Structures are given as C-alpha cells and as structure tokens.
Amino acid sequence: MLKNRELLKIFEQASHMMKLIEEHCICDCIWMEWEDLEAKTLDRRPPEQTRRERCSCGNGKRWAKPKITTEKKNHPDFMIDWMYFETPLSIQMK
C-alpha cells in the first residue's frame, strides 16, 4: 500500500505533466486516460493502448503516447520519469 506522501508526489507529477501536455497540444483541448497510479509506482505496466492521451476535439490524428522509464527501480523515493512524448508532430520534451 502506498503512503500518503508517495501518493502526493505521484499526483503532483501527474498534474505537472498534464500542464506540459496542454501546452504542447495543437488544438489546446486534451483528455487524459491515466492508468492505476499504484500500478505505475510498482512498475506494472498495462498494454500500450491504456496509456494514451487524446485531444477531446475528437480528431483521431492527434495522439500522444507517454514513455515511462525508471532510473532506479528499487530506490525508496522511486518516481515515474516521464521522459518524452511521441506525437505525429514529433514534439519531444525532456
């Protein structure tokens, strides 16, 4: 079970990532489908299609796919490292 402090860190990072996505979305309307936060922390990754973000305008061509990597999987302060996004426009963030 995750501690409150660990959950707060994850939510803060998710909120920060949401802002980055909104800033880089062409049509400025984004809809996020987040996977289970505890599963992310434990590095249990679901199939790729459950980790996709889609613009809420309904334009199927505008997708972003997060790449989740871990630097130190067993570190006590393990956090998800959102390295960059692959989009049709080849926008990359680090």
From Swiss-Prot:
The name this protein carries in UniProt is Putative uncharacterized protein encoded by LINC00597
Q: Which gene encodes it?
A: LINC00597
Where is it made, tissue-wise? Expressed in heart.
